[in-house]
Amino acid sequence: MKKGRTNLNYLVSARSLVSKVTFHEAVWLFPPSFILHVLEEWPRFTSWAQRYASPLYSQQDYETIHIAGIIGSIVFATIVWMFPVRAVVFVFFAFVLAPGLFFNVLFHAGATVVTSEYCPGVITALTLYLPVFLLLCRLAWSENLLNAPTLISGLVIAGAFHTWEVGHNVFKAW
């Protein structure tokens, strides 16, 4: 009985801690999530992409895109942290966060299902990207940094941007 109560106290404490985090603080979860995702993908994604997307996709492509992504995640987290206002959060959401996290989850999960083979990155996409994305959305919503119109339009922009980016960089379609 006492052990159950200890676990419950831990959960209550964790929930209390999370409830005190602000959007501009939580945005710092983005860079380490991105880095951990890259570490999962790095050794195997290129060969997977060459098999299922385009034989033209190279390790140099992967490294260029993802080193820029690591730098970008830090730069954009810094900008949002310094200027947590609606316009900045919307641009971050539409062009960085939603394409990089939410649509990346859909890409990796979908690719794993369609190919019936592990798509490198699916584990961190599901265990890190999705929870971090949902937390940041919830905090942005509760702090009135995103509302229904900006959330919906941001997702539409993010979906189009992610589709273009993956089509260009991974599938070499254009």
Regions found by a protein language model. Name each.
Residues 87, 109-119:
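Membrane-interface helix caps and helix-loop-helix hairpins in membrane proteins
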Residues 76-103, 143-151:
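Transmembrane helix-loop-helix
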Residues 41-59:
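Cytosolic, membrane-interface loops and tails of multi-pass inner-membrane proteins
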Residues 135-174:
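Terminal transmembrane helical module of multi-pass membrane proteins
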Residues 66-84, 103-104, 128-133:
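Core segments of transmembrane alpha-helices
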Residues 35-41, 101-112, 160-171:
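Transmembrane alpha-helical segments that form the membrane-embedded catalytic/substrate-channel core
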Residues 97-108, 121-139, 159:
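Hydrophobic alpha-helical membrane segments
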Residues 20-40:
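N-terminal signal-anchor transmembrane alpha helix
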